[in-house]
Curated annotation (Swiss-Prot):
Family, per entry: Belongs to the class I-like SAM-binding methyltransferase superfamily. TrmB family.
UniProt cross-references to Gene3D superfamilies, sorted A to Z: Vaccinia Virus protein VP39
Biological role stated in the UniProt entry: Catalyzes the formation of N(7)-methylguanine at position 46 (m7G46) in tRNA.
Name the UniProt record assigns to this protein: tRNA (guanine-N(7)-)-methyltransferase
Taxonomic lineage of the native organism: Bacteria, Pseudomonadati, Pseudomonadota, Alphaproteobacteria, Hyphomicrobiales
SUPFAM superfamilies, per the entry: S-adenosyl-L-methionine-dependent methyltransferases
Pathway: tRNA modification; N(7)-methylguanine-tRNA biosynthesis
Listed EC numbers: 2.1.1.33
InterPro entries: SAM-dependent_MTases_sf, tRNA_(Gua-N-7)_MeTrfase_Trmb, tRNA_methyltr_TrmB_bact
HAMAP family: tRNA_methyltr_TrmB (MF_01057)
Keywords, alphabetical: Methyltransferase, S-adenosyl-L-methionine, Transferase, tRNA processing
Enzyme class: transferase
Binding site for S-adenosyl-L-methionine: 62, 87, 116, 138
GO molecular function, one term: tRNA (guanine(46)-N7)-methyltransferase activity
Length: 233
């Protein structure tokens, strides 16, 4: 049996594990994840492109990639970009690793982290990322749980430190209260500017957007997605 150790911090709330993993998934967690996982016990390289065996021109981060569908899609379309994917939910990580067995060409420009994203953000060098995606994060819809949302001023300070000037933080949700919450925090932070001029700018999916399983469910249930983009000043 694999002991999948995690370390909780002030920013993580929720399940680490759901359905029982199949033996094939457990094998990928044991054998493949260690080859791709970022070890925070080592110092971060000044140039993050050195994390990747393949030559990459830039590095982007996706926080909470779920089963990895969007991340895999991005790697298909941006082969000269190095990607860092964070997913503390072990079932999502296992699904991603299974997909990587079928897309081995992506392994050389992908690095993974299976714990709290704030730990990774604190480890990264200043102005080291060319983009950050946070797509359909847990909205914690009950008001008493809103403090558990990833978007807060402390985490925006983290994001502002590691994101390069002129680069984008993209946020998608189908929960209106979380969209409004996110707008409030970003527009009250001195390091970001909201990239929007009219309604279609936050109702139109991002370029090359593949959609997600969660988004399909939201649309079936009558919820309208919101796509927010913020530029680091």
């Amino acid at each position: 049996m694999i002991d999948h150790k995690v370390h909780l911090s002030e920013a993580f709330f929720g399940r680490r594990k759901g359905k029982r993993l199949r033996n094939s998934q457990l094998a990928r967690i044991k054998m493949l994840l260690p080859t791709l996982k970022i070890d925070l016990n080592n110092s971060a390289p000044p140039d993050l492109t050195s994390l990747f065996p393949s030559k990459v021109r830039e590095v982007r981060l996706e926080i909470g990639f779920g089963g990895g569908e969007h991340l895999l899609h991005e790697m298909e379309h941006f082969p000269q970009t190095g990607f860092i994917g964070v997913e503390p939910f072990i079932n999502g990580m296992a699904k991603m690793l299974m997909s990587l067995e079928q897309h081995k060409q992506h392994q050389n420009h992908l690095r993974l982290y299976d714990d709290d994203a704030t730990r990774l953000l604190d480890w990264l060098p200043n102005a080291s990322l060319d983009g950050i995606d946070l797509l359909y994060p847990d909205p914690w819809p009950k008001k008493k749980h809103w403090k558990r949302r990833f978007i807060n001023m402390k985490n925006l300070n983290r994001v502002a430190r590691v994101l390069k000037i002129g680069k984008k933080f993209r946020f998608a949700t189908d929960i209106d209260s979380y969209a409004n919450w996110t707008l409030y925090y970003f527009t009250h932070h001195h390091s970001f500017e909201w990239e929007a001029e009219n309604l279609k700018d936050w109702k139109t999916p991002y370029p090359l957007w593949p959609g997600t399983r969660y988004e399909e469910k939201a649309l079936r249930e009558g919820r309208t997605p919101t796509y927010l983009t913020f530029i680091k000043k």
